[in-house]
Amino acid sequence: MIKTYRIYTTLLFALIQNIAMAGDLPDINLTPGSINASINQSNIQSTICVKGYTKIVRPPVYFTNSLKKKQMRDYGYADINPAHYEEDHLIPLSIGGNPSDPANLWPQARLSEWNAEKKDILEFKLYKLVCEGAVTLDDARHQISTNWIETYKRYVK
């Protein structure tokens, strides 16, 4: 019984280490971010700020699931369970990120402190600030693509 417990503990520890290896920020060489060039400050009220905009431009699940598996290999993640990641847009669709350019997508860990759910909170906050005119579109895009964690700390906490 104790031996089994030790094996499970060792396996759990190894899994946690592997998940942490995914990193909380994307590799800028693989995922530098990419914008939708048709979205700019002058047209946000008729594009990204319109309810339902992201549903129109979001790529299909079969595309993102396939890309996620490829990018998990490209990133060299030790944990290769796709369910542990969300294929996330570095520059979110809600602030005019490119929907289908692999340079704007990466497999973001779900099981870390700085996970996909936290980034979603930041994405909504930036969307509101941009649409209210409190932050420019370019500034929001730059901040989230440079270091989304620091941007989260600035605007959410």
Briefly describe each language-model feature range.
Residues 2-85, 94-157:
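Nuclease and nuclease-like effector domains acting on nucleic acids or nucleotide cofactors
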